[in-house]
Design a protein with these regions (language model features):
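Intrinsically disordered, low-complexity terminal regulatory regions
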Residues: 1-60, 126-127, 134-147
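Allosteric regulatory "coupling" segments in signal-transduction proteins
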Residues: 24, 57-77
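A short, aliphatic-rich beta-strand micro-motif
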Residues: 78-87
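Structural motif
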Residues: 80, 92-94
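Short beta-strand-to-loop transition segments that serve as allosteric relay/switch motifs
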Residues: 95-103
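Amphipathic alpha-helical "output/dimerization" segments
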Residues: 105-125, 132
């Protein structure tokens, strides 16, 4: 159920999810972060992307199986915001958030999303490096398909 949560409460839950994360290739904490943001605010979709190579191409790090209704892009999106995830001035990815509300991204929302992006950047360059490695690794082509 969707309910508007305070910034402090939402940030505390996000930091808890990142701190309690155990490396796993079956479940990503990024899915939990996206779900917390969608359920705790008036967002219709949240995407977490990583800059993988020097060409600026990105890979989606959230893999939703099954897709949470709030994590599917909606054609009625009215507002979008991109927040850069940076560590020491180096861009490592971005947080993409969409809302079906007209005035969804006021100053408080921007501060919240910038703090979430900062927490994600710290996580992805620290304890969450396994997610970066997984996203950067090309998927192998099956031998039958290569022939």
């Amino acid at each position: 159920m969707k309910s508007y949560r305070s910034t402090r409460s939402l940030l505390a839950d996000i930091e808890r999810v990142l701190a309690e994360n155990r490396p796993s290739f079956h479940h990503s904490p990024l899915e939990d972060i996206a779900a917390l943001l969608v359920e705790g605010r008036h967002y219709s979709w949240v995407g977490i992307y990583l800059s993988v190579d020097s060409n600026g191409s990105t890979a989606l790090l959230e893999d939703t199986h099954p897709a949470h209704p709030g994590q599917m892009a909606v054609s009625t999106t009215r507002k979008k915001i991109l927040i850069t995830m940076k560590i020491a001035g180096r861009e490592i990815g971005y947080l993409n958030v969409e809302s079906d509300r007209e005035n969804a991204f006021g100053p408080q929302e921007r501060v919240l999303l910038e703090r979430v992006a900062g927490a994600l950047a710290g996580f992805l360059t620290g304890r969450g490096k396994y997610l970066v490695r997984k996203a950067a690794k090309p998927t192998p082509v099956p031998k039958a398909a290569a022939a």
